[in-house]
Amino acid sequence: MITGKNFIGNVLSSIGDVTFKTFNPLANIENEIVYSEASEIEIQQAVELAANAFSVFKTVSGAKKSEFLNEIANEIEGLGDELIKVYCSETGLPEGRARGERGRTVFQLRSFANLVKEGSWVEATIDTADLDRKPIPKVDIRKMLVPIGPVVVFGASNFPLAYSTAGGDTAAAFAAGCPVIIKSHPMHAGTGELVASAIIKAALTTGMPNGVFSNLNSSGIEVGVSLVKHSQVKAVGFTGSIRGGRALYNLAAQRPEPIPVFAEMGSVNPVVILPSAIKNNENNWAKTYAGSITLGAGQFCTNPGLILGIKGGDLTNFIQILSDEIIKIEPTCMLHPAIIGAYENNKTKMQEQDGLKTTASLNKDVADNYGKQTITTVEGTTFLNNTALHQEVFGPFSMVVQCENMQQLSAIISKLEGQLTGTILADNNELENYPSLVSALQNRVGRIIFNGVPTGVEVCPAMVHGGPYPASTDSRFTAVGINSIKRWVRPFSFQSWPNDLLPNELKSENPLKISRLIDGKQTINKI
C-alpha cells in the first residue's frame, strides 16, 4: 500500500509541511495520493543513518550483498500487478513497457548479485615483499577497490524503474558497499515508494543495517540541493537534462570537500549515412529510423536526433520516405506535462532557426500530452555555422543534415559535443574507406554502432553507456553494466599489513578463491 511518506531508513516519516501529487498524463488528471516532501530534519536523519550504516555495510561480504540484491529483485517481482498499475498511471506508458522495464531492473540487480558473489571485481592486486632487494628492501603492498561512502541517486523521469529507485545506479552502489539515499522523482513518487518498500523488506530480511537505504520525496529542487551539499554524502548519480546534471555537478564542486557527480545527460546520437547504405535500401532504413525516432515518444536518451548524409538524390529520397513513414505512426503519450511543454517549446525554437525546413510534422489533433513527431532538414553549411542547431530536442524529433561532401560531414562530426552514441550506416567495403571519419566519431561518443539503431541499451558487461561531456560528466565510466560499479569505489592500499587483519580478498591464502594480480601475474593461487 502506498502511504505518501518518506522512508528514513526503515521508518516511514512525513513531518514536513509541503505536499504534492503525481499526474496521470494519459487521463490528464492528478492522481489521488498525496505525498509528503522530505523536510530538512528528515534529510539530516537519512544522511546520518546512511553514514552510520556505511561503517557496517562496507564490511559486508560479497555473498551477503549478493543475497541482499537478489532479495530486492524477488521483492520487486512480488509487488506484482500493483507496481505495473501505478507505473502506468504515473507515466502514461503502456503495460508492456512497464513489464519490460521491471524485467530489466531485476536483471540488473541479479547481475550485480552474481558479480559480488564471485568477488574478483575488487581487482585485488598484491606485490609481495622482497627484503633482500638492494639498495632498498621492497615492502609488501596490497590493493583493492573499496566503497566510497553514502551515495545520493536522483530518480530519472523517463525510466521509473530501470534508472530510478532500484535502478542501475542503486544496484551498483549496493554492490560496491555504499548506502543509497534516493531523491525520488516527483512524477512517479508512487512507483518509487513501492520499489522503496521492496528494498526495505529485502534489507530487513537479509540483516542489512538500518540506513542502508532511504527514499525521500521531493517536488522541487530543494531536497536534492540539500543532499548534494551534505558533508556526509560522498557521491551522486543522476540521469536527466544537461541543465539539471550540470547544476548538481557545480554544487558538488563548490563544496569544501568536492565529490564526484556521475551524470548521464544530453545527447543527439548522430547517425552517419554513407552513400552505399541508401543507394538501394533507403526504404528499409527510413522505416527503421521512423520507428526508432518515435519509440517511447522519443523519450530515450539514445534517440537518434541527428542524421548526417551526403546531399543528392538518394538522400532526398531517404528524407521523403522517412517523413512519409513517421507520419503514419500513431503518436503516443509523453511522460508528464513538463516534458511535453519542453518538447513543444524546444521544437518551436529549432524550427525558427534560419535555414531549417520541416519535412514532416503531424498536423492532426491529438490528445493532451501526446507528442507530435517531426522531421526537419538543413544544409550542412548552415548547420556548421549555427550551434543552436546542435542542441537536443527531447522527444520524437530528428534533423537530417545534407552535407556537401565527406569533408564537410567530417567537419560537422568534429564540431559536435560529446554524445552517448554514434551510428554509421554503410556496407563493409565503404566503411573501410573512411577511417578518419570513424576515428572522428569515436572521439565524440561512448558507443559506436554499425548498421543498427541507437535506441536500446543492452545490459551486459561490454556495454558503455556514457560519453564525452555533455553526454556524461565523466567519460571514463559507464552507467549501464557491471562496470558501472566503478563509479562508487576508490582504490585503497595496505602496506606491510598483518595478514590476519587484511580483508579476505587480500589475504595470502585467498579464502574467497578470487582472481588476483600477484607480482604481475593473474592467478587464483594462494601466496
Predicted regions located by residue number:
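C-terminal core of ALDH-fold dehydrogenases
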Residues: V366-N369, M406, A411-L502, I524
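Structural signal for hydrophobic packing residues in well-ordered secondary-structure cores
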Residues: A51-F54, K58, A73-G80, I84-Y87, ...
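Short loop-to-beta-strand entry elements in the cores of soluble alpha/beta enzymes
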Residues: F68, A176-T191, V212, E257-L274, ...
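NAD(P)-dependent aldehyde/semialdehyde dehydrogenase
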Residues: T3, I15, K287, G309-L420
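N-terminal Rossmann-like NAD(P)+-binding subdomain of aldehyde/semialdehyde dehydrogenases
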Residues: M1-V139, K526
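Rossmann-like NAD(P) dinucleotide-binding subdomain of oxidoreductase/dehydrogenase enzymes
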Residues: S120-A290, K311-T316, N525
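Short acidic active-site motifs
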Residues: E42, E222-V223, Q408
